[in-house]
Structures are given as C-alpha cells and as structure tokens.
Amino acid sequence: MKQIWQALKAHQQAVEHRAILDLFADPRRAETFSTRLGDMLFDWSKTNIDHTARDLLIDLAGAAGVAEKREAMFSGAKINETEGRAVLHTALRNMDRPVRVDGVDVTPALRETHARMQAFVRDLRSGRFKGQGGPITDVVNIGIGGSDLGPAMACLALAPYADGPRCQFVSNVDGAHIHDTLKDLDPATTLVIVASKTFTTIETMTNAETAKRWMATRVSDPAAQFAAVSTAADRTAAFGIDASRVFGFEDWVGGRYSMWGPIGLALMIAIGPEEFDAFLAGGAEMDRHFREAPFAENLPVLLALVGLWHNQICGHATRAVLPYDQRLARLPAYLQQLEMESNGKRVAMDGHELTHHSGPIVWGEPGTNGQHAFYQLIHQGSRIVPCEFLVAREGHEPDLAHQHLLLVSNCLAQSEALLRGRSVEEARAILARKGLTGSELERQARHRVFPGNRPSTVLAYEKLTPATLGRIVALYEHRVFVEGVILGINSYDQWGVELGKELALALQPMLEGRAGTEGKDGSTAQLVSYLRC
C-alpha cells in the first residue's frame, strides 16, 4: 500500500495546478466520471481525479482489503476488534437471509422485534393504543447521539410521508430543550420514547425523569405512556415501562448505525410501517450494490475514494455537505456523527499512531441558505473546501414547481461556479460595462475574481422518498466503512467520548459546593468558582 500512497501523492503534486475545467476537453469526461444506481446519479467529474488517479485509488482499495473486509462485515465477523463485536446494522434491513453471529442465525430474532414494532405502531396509529386522555397525538423521542440524530434527520426528511402522530426529539441535557418541547403538549395524549441501550445514559435518563414528572401532572399512570428502546429489561421495568413496549437491539448494532431497527421507532410511528419498510428496502438495495458492483462502478467505494483523495492526498481538511433540499437540513449534523465519530481516530487497528490524517471535518447547511452565509469562503477563501451537493429532480409540492426549479438551478450554478470561477479579465469586462475605469476598475476587479478550480460532487436523485433516503444513508454508511478500512482504523468504536463524561461526573459535586477543586488546573478551578450553582 505504501507504494500506492506514494504514487498518488506524486501524481497529485504533478497535476495540482491543472485546471479541472481542462479535463472536460474529453467529451466523455462527465459520463466516465459519473456512476448510476437506479434513479441515483453520482457525478464526480468536477474533481481533479483523472484516469491515472482513479486507477491508483481503486488499486489502493484493493490493496487495503476492502473486498475481504466487506464480506467479513456482512458475514458477522467481529471486525470491531477493540470491543470484540460484529458490525451488523446491515442485518436490520436484510432480514430475509441468514446472518450468523457466534454460529447463531440472528435474523429470526430481528424479524420478531420488527413484527412487534409494526404491531405496536399500527395499534398506536389506529387509536387502539390510547393515552389516558385519548388517542396519541404527539410522540417525544428522548435520546442522544445515535439515538437522536438519525431518526430526527429521517423524520424531517420524510415529512411528506408523515401521516401519524407528530414526532419531536429531545437530546440535550440542557433543561431548555425538554421544557420547550413539552410546554405546548398534552401529557394525556403524548407518548414518550426513551432510547438508551443501557438505560443509563445520563442526558437521556435525566430528561426521561423530567418527562415522567411532567406526565404525572395530568395522568395517574405516567409510565403507561412510555416506551423504551433498550436492552436493559431490569431498568426499564424499574422505570415502570411494560415489557410489551420495550424494544431491544444487539451490541453489534452501533448507535450511529441503529435507526434501521428499534431506534427508528419514532420514524415508523411518523410514516407508518409500510413506508418504513420502503426505507429499509432502499438501504438493502445499496447493500446489494455495495457487495456486487465492481469498485470502478461502486457508489460507496467511489464516494470514499473521492473523499480520501481530497483529504489524505490533497490535504483538504474539511468536507462541506450541501443538500439542496430543506428537508435534509439535519443531514450534515447526522453525517458529522456518522463520519467524525467513526473515522475521527488517531490510532490504527494495530495500536500504533497513524502516520497520516484520519477522517475530515464534516459540516454543512442546506442550500440555498448557505449561499448567503459561508459560500463566500468556499468561493474566495484561501482554503479549498471540497463540496458535496445533493439535489432531487422533483420536489413534493407540484404547485411550487417554479421554486424547485430555482433551487435546482442554484445548486448546479454553485457547482459550476466552483469549477469555472471568474478571471480578472472577466471581472474587468463586467466593471467596464458598469462604467468603471482606470485605477478604480483595477482595484475593484481584484475583489471580484473567483479562483475556481475547486472540487465538488453532485448526488442527484429523482425524489426524496423513503427508499431514496434509505439508499442515501446506506451509501454514506458504506463510505465510512471503506475509508476506515483504507486508513487502517476501527470505524465502530468511540472511545473519544468517554473522558469528558468521566470528568463531568467529578465536576458535579464541585459545582454544587460539596467538594473542592484541588487537583484541577487554574482555569477549570476559576470557572467552577464562577459557575458554581
């Protein structure tokens, strides 16, 4: 692999100052550097990757053992080596084929849990399951991290399909979050879902207790309007939640990969079991494509290789995710966790420190909002930010088709502007037409130059349906896997979240005045003194 890395770096240095636009002298450039899956088109032709770079990147994936590790993952091998676990979130959307963990086929249990979820959701949506004040009108999902970001993103994304109770999400331990969520709801017609695998997550359980007290202000049996997504049956029982409303999942489903199963309960309530199954089917379709398509035509592999080229080879530290779809407003935040918690590591699988950078910083906002915020830096800043645009051919509001046309035209315009830029000669001509001359024209022209030659990709699709969202989420999941394999890291643990938790527990008695700050650094001690409650 070392030789391939070196060859990639040498090639990148040789073509670093080449105009990407010049690559389109090849009339088949766009077609050759695009890949399709059904109605989905991934266009990566506006990058500086040429045939040589593409072939080297594909060789890199082969040398890293992506194909072998991919089959190990799907087969239930314990590829999460630091925790000794399989990685089988894919089984949640592929329940029609046996998958064995430690020699046991896990799919019958998955199908049973899925059927229990469907039955509960149908009862709730039909009104057979009622609150103590009538049919359930609102659902509040309490969770954090993977128990929040995925289902919250998906519920917003699939709002046109949401014909069930209103679903809201509480994650932050900041009391303002749960206060503002509950203040206009009726406890007697609200269901609260507590999503915590261990039922010990401090933020989630603090909010759950607050919700239970709120529920008790209107109903005689608060726990009767709670459901849980947890494997801790003893703790859910102690909380008062009946076992029929407790849905568990296995330790081989990581939190940030878990919305395909019980963590997606709120999503299933919102859109119904049939549309939820369409979401699963979309993910399963991407799984099949990922397993079967050759690397040169494989969307997750190519998305990963483009990302590796920009981050590891070109040295671009960030990646902007720019969905031109307001209902995908939460996608960048979801992908922040998916990618940065998975591949934000500094130690390789063998325990040695990495000799290269790990995953990039992922951020973004929906278009066109971002155009009036941070696109200034993307177009004219001194750092190059590779951009990933997402856009649908068709919206959900036929009476607002003219607005969707504006949306799509803006998306394509931004992608083209990043590629093409605007030269100083073009800027001068524009200013001259406005009547400027001489030194003032020259001064102003410099400010109106767009360097261009900034890479971007576009993921286009017909319409944001449940199946399409399933394909998109699975695409990014597998992208993370491929990047992690090539970087030599474990994408499925998250030890980086632990230290802060431990220190927070120690700081609580100090902030309450029950303990001194001995042993703390001067800054922390000063802040404790100032913020003491």
UniProtKB/Swiss-Prot annotation:
Keywords: Cytoplasm, Gluconeogenesis, Glycolysis, Isomerase. Signal peptide: none annotated. Pathway: Carbohydrate biosynthesis; gluconeogenesis; Carbohydrate degradation; glycolysis; D-glyceraldehyde 3-phosphate and glycerone phosphate from D-glucose: step 2/4. It catalyses: alpha-D-glucose 6-phosphate = beta-D-fructose 6-phosphate. Pfam families: PGI. Its EC number is 5.3.1.9. This is Glucose-6-phosphate isomerase. The gene is pgi.
